[in-house]
From Swiss-Prot:
The gene is Pym1. The modification N-acetylmethionine is found at M1. This is Partner of Y14 and mago. It comes from Mus musculus. Residues 98-113 have a biased composition (Basic and acidic residues). Residues 151-203 are annotated as: eIF2A-like. Key regulator of the exon junction complex (EJC), a multiprotein complex that associates immediately upstream of the exon-exon junction on mRNAs and serves as a positional landmark for the intron exon structure of genes and directs post-transcriptional processes in the cytoplasm such as mRNA export, nonsense-mediated mRNA decay (NMD) or translation. Acts as an EJC disassembly factor, allowing translation-dependent EJC removal and recycling by disrupting mature EJC from spliced mRNAs.
Amino acid sequence: METASTPEATGTGKYIASTQRPDGTWRKQRRVKEGYVPQEEVPVYENKYVKFFKSKPELPPGLSPEATTPVTPSRPEGGETGLSKTAKRNLKRKEKRRQQQEKEAEALSRTLDKVSLGDTAQIPSALQGPQATPLAASDPSDSAATTEKAKKIKNLRKKLRQVEELQQRIQAGEVSQPSREQLEKLARRRVLEEELEDLELGL
């Protein structure tokens, strides 16, 4: 791309020669007044702070650019990078604890495989010690399942109550022409009762 050349003096004034645009088209030659500066050559205004920071060196005084090359840190001997001794010790403790829990869980599963459901009185005394904690840990999941069942029971009772109310309204004559959904609700009553019975027996 050709850039705008400086205005050329002719007999009647100055001209800016024709130039090529970035897209390949040509600008016409233009006649300009005395003292005209093309837009591309006008310096961009910079306030004093911008000028100060541009003139300011990036490095502190007296520091050579060679001294600022980044240094790659050497890896510490214990595989974890950047950890203190205490943090490494804590990691080792956690790892040992995790391995211990895995061993306890394996031992518990082996003893549970050996013991049948009918022989609950013959559970080894080894389970009474530290291995009783995995059983206690499973209690929250059991309680979550129990609360889930309780919610389902409550929901089913609510649906049954709605079905009974609908049936009473139909019998009282409040609803003369029940809609299709209402009839489906009435038809589902037996299924809801059976499901409620199953859940209550499961608790």
